[in-house]
Each structure stands twice: as C-alpha cells, then as structure tokens.
Regions:
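Short loop/turn motifs that connect adjacent beta-strands in outer-membrane beta-barrel proteins
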Residues: 53-64, 92-100, 126-131, 179-180, ...
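Gram-negative/organellar outer-membrane beta-barrel architecture
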Residues: 58-68, 72-211, 367, 375-389
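Membrane-embedded beta-strand positions of outer-membrane beta-barrel proteins
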Residues: 68-70, 86, 105-107, 132-136, ...
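Extracellular loop and loop/strand-boundary signature of outer-membrane beta-barrel proteins
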Residues: 105-106, 154-159, 200-206, 242-248, ...
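C-terminal outer-membrane beta-barrel translocator/porin domains of Gram-negative envelope proteins
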Residues: 215-220, 224-322
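Outer-membrane beta-barrel "beta-signal"
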Residues: 216-219, 355-363, 378-389
C-alpha cells in the first residue's frame, strides 16, 4: 500500500511528460487535406493532458491566473489520501514592483477517516507597502500520540491512537520598512479536542478540549525572490505570540518562533537552501500548543507530532537540482531535537534527517513535491505543493 502513491505519482508524471514530448517532438506536418479538415473534438483525457502540458507557462500578464490540481497523495500520519487544490495568483497590471499575490483553497480526505479543508494565501498591497498573510483550516484527524518530551516520543511502547478535531485561524498584517524589513501585528485562534484516547495517561492530566486565543507581532527581513520557491535571497523572522488569561485561555503561556533561511544558486541549474529554526513555549502551555519537531516540512523522516516539548531546534541544508524539462530532484540532510532544558541536549537526543525527493513543475515556479525521508529508527513519504522551506 505504501508504494501505491509513488507508482501513481510516477505514472501520472510519465503520461504528462510523454504527452508533452509527443506534442512538441513528433507532430507531422499537415497535408493540404488536413489544413481544411474540421478540428477533431478532444475527449476528457486529451483535455486533461493538454491542461497539465501547458500549466507551467508564464501567465504573469493575466490579472488572475487560476489552476486546479488533484489526485492521490500520501503521508505517514494521514496514510493514502485524495487531495484537491484550487490555486490562484493575481496582481495589478499597472504595478510591476508588487509581487503576485496568491490564494489556495484546498480539501483532502483519506481512507483512515482523515479530512481537512481550508484557505491560505498572501495578499500584497500596491507597491508592496503591506502584506496580509492568512490561513484558516479545519480537520478531523485520526493520529498517534507518544506523550510529552523526547524520552516519551522515543519509547515505542507509548505509541497510541487518538482522534484530533482541530480548527485554526491565523492572521498577520505586515508593514514594509526600508531595507526589506517587515513588522506588524499577528493574531491566532485554535480549537483542539482529543477524543478516543487509547492511552489517556500520556496526557499527564491535561485538558482534552482546548481553546487558545493569541495576539502578538511578527518582525522579519525578507529578500527572497519568491517565498514559496525561492532561488535567491534570505529570510530572517521572529514570531512572538502571547496567550494571556484575560483573553479566555485556560493555559496561559507565550510562544517564540525564530527562522533563518538562505538560498543561493551555486550553478546554473542547482540551488542550495539552508534553514535554521527554533521554537520555545514559556509558562504553562498545553499539549496541543507545544513546539513539535518540524517533521511536516524541513525535518522529514518522522511522524509529525511524535516529538514535542517546550523547545525545538533544527537545521537543514537542501540541494535542489533541475533534471529534465519540468522535472527536478532534491537531496537534504539535517538534524533536530526537542527538549525542556538546554542541558538535556546530547548526542543521544539528536534526531537526524536525510532524504531525496522528486519535483514536477505544476505551474510556473510552483512545484509538486514527493519526498522520502529517513530519520532515527523512522522513515516517511509525503507529497505536497511548493518546497519544504
């Protein structure tokens, strides 16, 4: 079963690539009779092939460019799932200085009972003076839980099932300052409910129905040419959020997240990407709001949410190489850790990651990614949109 999504992904990619080569490479010249013949009606399969064959053409001259993609995908936490994505990119035709804004509406469901839908995007105001970053989603998620702390996560005997019902909304309004600096307020809401707990003792007596209301600020320096698929530039960001009692929080705490990323084209068809990331929760955070090893993005190779504690650190380097036409591949390596106190970090608590991935350019500079990662006594396979970081 775990190989099925890989085979489907490769089969679809091969069909699209072959169709494109047929269209471009072996079309015979028309005879006089052909030139006056009525156009043949295309069936649904031909229309789909034509759509994907031209989906990566540069359409920046269009005021609004919308695309649709769907199909099977896989991750260790959700198993085999069917996903659909409607993606739009838009900008003012009269403002060449402003990057293209983007919006995505997505939905997915799996054979395990997982379903998720939401909307996310980045809206750039004229002349890039302000940016609105938004994300809202709802999910029903059969998951596994190991407990809190590295020792609990590393204990295979703690692996247990539960179901997570979650709603999240986050907003950031960023104002541009000189030298590519952005600063602005941020708001966050989340609802988390754990049900059908196989091992309630692993929650250490914490509540299983949680509302979290947060306010804070974001400060960043961003010179990337394209946030979702950068080839040059760097990003340094600080996200500080407070969850005080007066806002209705049962668990009062604050959370700090810091990220630094750098991208450089070392050769014509190859890019190296570097990321260092850290998150810390102070006070009395609940199990749902603790930092977790970033297994869904940079530190691939682990079950997402397995390792969680008050602090998380990770560092990853990735090489991205164009391969042929719309195809490319990546290789990466890195390390991460979760801990309550810095004194707990040692070679036994480090969590390495390494892996390889396939890339296919769905739209101009928007990639579909398929990654296979290996971690410490763990491995994972996932399919997604855009680069991991």
């Amino acid at each position: 079963m775990k190989r099925l999504p890989i085979l489907l992904f490769c089969l679809i990619s091969a069909i699209i690539c072959s169709a494109q080569e047929i269209r471009e490479g072996i079309s015979a010249p028309e005879s006089p009779a052909d030139s006056v013949a009525a156009p043949r009606k295309r069936n649904i399969i031909q229309k789909v092939i034509d759509y994907f064959a031209h989906s990566n053409e540069d359409k920046s001259d269009k005021k609004f460019d919308i695309s649709v993609i769907g199909g099977p995908s896989y991750s260790e936490s959700t198993s085999l799932k069917i996903a659909a994505l409607i993606s739009g990119m838009y900008k003012s035709r009269h403002d060449s200085l402003t990057p293209r804004s983007d919006v995505s509406i997505y939905g997915q469901g799996s054979i395990t009972g997982f379903y998720n839908f939401g909307i996310r995007g980045n809206h750039f105001f004229p002349q890039d003076k302000m940016r609105l970053v938004y994300d809202a989603n709802f999910c029903h998620f059969p998951l596994k839980f190991w407990g809190i702390g590295y020792a609990q996560g590393a204990n295979k005997a703690n692996e247990s099932d539960y179901t997570l019902l979650q709603s999240e909304v986050s907003l950031q309004l960023l104002f541009r300052l000189p030298h590519h600096i952005f600063i602005g307020p941020a708001a966050q809401f989340s609802y988390n409910r754990a049900t059908k707990q196989e091992r309630p003792d692993l929650w250490d007596g914490q509540g299983t129905r949680l509302f979290n209301y947060g306010m804070g600020f974001v400060l960043s320096v961003d010179t990337r040419d394209l946030p979702g698929n950068a080839s040059t530039g760097y990003y340094i960001g600080l996200n500080q959020t407070f969850f005080p009692r007066f806002m209705g929080n049962d668990y009062t705490f604050s959370r700090t997240e810091v990220s630094a990323m750098y991208y450089h084209r070392f050769w014509a068809s190859g890019i190296m990407a570097f990321r260092v990331h850290g998150a810390a929760a102070y006070g009395n955070p609940s199990w749902a709001m603790l930092p977790t090893l970033d297994a869904g993005n940079a530190v691939r190779g682990y079950y997402e949410g397995r390792y969680r504690d008050k602090n998380e650190l990770d560092a990853v380097v990735e090489v991205r190489q164009h391969l042929y036409r719309r195809f490319g591949f990546v290789v990466w390596g890195g390390i991460g850790s979760v801990f309550e106190h810095f004194s707990q970090i040692n070679r036994h608590t480090l969590l390495p990651t390494a892996g390889i991935g396939l890339r296919w350019e769905f739209k101009n500079r928007v990639n579909v990614r398929a990654d296979f990662g290996v971690g410490k006594h763990s491995k994972s396979f996932s399919v997604g949109i855009n680069e991991a970081f």
